[in-house]
Each structure stands twice: as C-alpha cells, then as structure tokens.
Amino acid sequence: MWGLVVFLTPQYLSVFIFMHISTPGRICLFGEHQDYLGLPVIAAAISRRIHVQGEARSDQKIHINMPDIQSEETFFLEPDLKYTRARDYFKSAINVLRRDGYVFDRGFDVEVHGNIPINSGTSSSSALLVSWIHFLTHMATEKPKDTVTQFEIGRYAVAAEVLEFGEPGGMMDQFSTALGNIMYLESLPAPMALSYPVKLGKFVLGDSLEPKDTLGILKHVKFGMLDIIDILKKKDPSFELSTFPAQEAERFRSDLTAEQYKLLQGNLSDRDILREAKGMFETNQIDNQRIGELLNIHQDSL
C-alpha cells in the first residue's frame, strides 16, 4: 500500500512519497532446520505481520522509530555505511541494494510496528528486513529496473541478513516471508521457490515466552549433522543426505554415537515426510488427517 504526495515550491517541484509495506511471519511446516543442510523446506505465512511505513526527507538522515520495543535508530546516508553493531540490518539492506544499482539521495522518516512474537522462531527479523528492503526498492532515487519481484526481494534479504554477516543460517526465513502463502524452497544448487495455492485448516500459534536459542540449535542440528555427514562420507564416499535411503541407516549405527544416530534418523525421516507432503500440495489433493500425522511425526523428530 502506498501513496504519493506532491508539494510545489516557487523554485522546484519536490515529490515526497509515503509508503506502507507489511510482511507476514512464517511457520515451518516440513523440513525444519533442513535448509541449513541444503535440503528442501515447506513453510507457510501466518497472519501476524511487520509493518514499515514512512516518507522521504529533504536531507540524508534516516530515522527509524520502533515504538513496540521502545527503541529508535538514526544514521546518515554515507557513501559506505559502516556497521556499528551485530546484525545491523537497516544498513546492510542499503549496502546490498546499492551494490545492485539502487541509489539513495535522500533519507527517510520511518516507523516500524508489528505483532509477530520476537525471538520466537516465527521470523520476525526476516519479516522486518523484507519489509525494509521492499520499502527501499520503492523509495530509491534511481533503480536498476522499474519493478522488483518477491523472489528478488527474498534474495536481497538473504544477502543482507545471512551473507553480509557470515551467519550460518539458511534461506527459508527470507524467502518464505517475501513470498508468503505456502512455499516450497530448494536452496541447492540455486534457490528455487514454488507457491502452492492450497487451503489448509487453521493453525494455532502459541508463544512460550522463552527466547529461541538460535545458536544452540545451529550447533546441534547443523554442525552436528555436518559432522555426521563427514563421518559417513569417509565410510562411504557416495553418501548423500538428499538421496540416501532411510531404511539403510542401520548399517551406519556402529559408526555413530547413539545421539548422532538418532539425529541421522530424524533428518532422513523429516526429508521423506516433506516429500510426501509435497506430493499432496502439488496435486492439491490434501488429506488433512494425513497432513496432521506428518506434522506430528516431524515434530517428534525435532
């Protein structure tokens, strides 16, 4: 949603644009934590959103007000924006877009608000970044092209959130919030996303009020699984997580600790569960009871 306001002065025509962008959070239906490992995921947008609204200024100051968390941020459009804190996403988005040909000659007054639970695993940070990038692509003084697709916004968000800071995460959060709906994502060999126009039942999202331990999860799930893959490839160089039959995992039991073997079984099970669900989504022949069973199996293995 956007609006255009034109102000005339005796000396020149000055155009100020007011822009309002909103982006949904997401839940992962199938493949949770597997995008870290190059496997596909299926995610769904939720009805909780982040809103970014604002207008251009006459100078190069950017002021961002975040009343929900009683915070604000101010910086200026210098030629090379330096990061002053971890995950400095407001600046990284501008740097990424500039490298792709976007030009920003004026600053902005911006307000951010939303109702996605923070640090709860529903992609509040990615939804914020996607909204901010979408806002910036509209507000740029010069653009490499007239329109930008939702997929491209997702790609920019991956660059600004993950690649720019060397983060170990995957691509699900950025693409699922940028694309919305129910989305299937493959990250290898190159990002590819499909949107499924299927209707599922209602989901109830509960907030435990306990912060998500992102680094702890990554240490166990991603790096733990990468260690397992390294062990198995030394035993069998042909091993590939994407194709290895789950029923053959037993032959590696003696090569792994009990915890490693359980993690391997869980990843193989989650991979195959996603494939079954994907088949239903692609044909739009949804068996709600079976979807529920698959969701339960998936959650049990996490």
What is each of the regions a protein language model found here?
Residues 150-162, 288-296:
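Short, well-structured alpha-helical segments that form the helix of a local strand-helix-strand
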Residues 127, 131, 152, 170, ...:
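Generic recognition of stable, solvent-exposed alpha-helical segments in well-folded globular domains
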Residues 3, 14-126, 130-150, 164, ...:
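ATP-binding N-lobe of GHMP and related small-molecule kinases
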Residues 14-28, 51-88, 98-99, 184-302:
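C-terminal nucleotide
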